[in-house]
């Protein structure tokens, strides 16, 4: 699962017994060599889908981590690209990724639930971060994103279809979430990371309540399941003009 340059089991255990912020500070130097980093195939598929509605002027990578989404935004944005995350360690790694050419790039340490921006962006993207938010936090999070988008701006992120019940993937995610719930019941500070808490129906409903118009776009690069449904979709939430 992890390469020789990735974190050891001991390092992962220390991270898991820390807060989310401290845990990612510790993991940051080796994060890109773990399966937690968003795969390049997902980043490329999202960039290709968004190119059809671009270009954009200013983009924001929400919960940017080590900056994997930077390549997506620099392909799409002409003016500036901003990454925001509350882990100083992850931002430190991200700063080393800035290309020599392209739009202006800035990194901001802040909590996604209290973004320090006005309506300054035409595009907000996020990759693999929503498991760190409890369902009750989604309304506030989406309201924050709505507030930093200009009229007509888009909030886009990929969503993979959940594993079928009784498959190995289903039991793995169910077991992971169960372990995290036990850990958080017994240990402080909590480490919020739940793979099964981000349900597409609930997400769409909360986005619409926050004032977005929501569209689901299949990502054809990942094919379809036996029932014909897409294996991966991109959620595009647009702030009305």
Regions found by a protein language model. Give the residues of each.
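Conserved class I S-adenosyl-L-methionine
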Residues: 1-54, 72, 156-180
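Class I SAM-dependent methyltransferase SAM/SAH-binding core
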Residues: 60, 66-114
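A conserved beta-strand element that flanks and buttresses the S-adenosyl-L-methionine
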Residues: 125
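A short glycine-rich, Lys/Arg-flanked "PGG" loop and its adjoining helix->strand segment in the class I
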Residues: 139-151
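Acceptor-substrate binding/catalytic loop of class I
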Residues: 186-200
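Conserved S-adenosyl-L-methionine
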Residues: 212-223
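Core SAM-dependent methyltransferase catalytic element
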Residues: 223-241
């Amino acid at each position: 699962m992890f390469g020789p340059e990735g974190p050891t089991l001991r390092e992962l255990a220390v991270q898991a017994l820390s807060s989310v912020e401290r845990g990612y500070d510790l993991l940051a130097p080796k994060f890109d060599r773990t399966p937690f980093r968003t795969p390049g195939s997902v980043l490329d598929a999202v960039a290709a889908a968004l190119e059809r509605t671009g270009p954009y002027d200013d983009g924001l990578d929400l919960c940017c981590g080590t900056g994997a989404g930077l390549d997506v935004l620099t392909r799409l944005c002409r003016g500036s690209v901003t990454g925001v995350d509350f882990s100083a360690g992850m931002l430190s790694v991200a700063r080393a990724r800035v290309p020599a050419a392209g739009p202006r790039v800035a990194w901001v340490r802040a909590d996604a639930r209290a973004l320090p921006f006005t309506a300054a962006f035409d595009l907000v993207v996020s990759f693999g971060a929503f498991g760190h938010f409890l369902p009750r936090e989604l309304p506030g999070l989406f309201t924050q994103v709505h507030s930093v988008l200009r009229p007509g701006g888009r909030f886009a992120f990929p969503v993979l279809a959940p594993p079928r019940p009784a498959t190995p993937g289903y039991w793995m995610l169910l077991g992971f979430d169960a372990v995290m719930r036990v850990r958080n019941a017994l240990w402080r500070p909590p480490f919020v990371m739940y793979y099964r808490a981000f349900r597409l129906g609930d997400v769409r409903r909360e986005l619409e309540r926050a004032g977005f118009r929501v569209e689901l776009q299949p990502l054809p690069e990942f094919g379809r399941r036996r029932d014909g449904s897409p294996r991966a979709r991109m959620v595009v939430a647009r702030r009305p003009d």
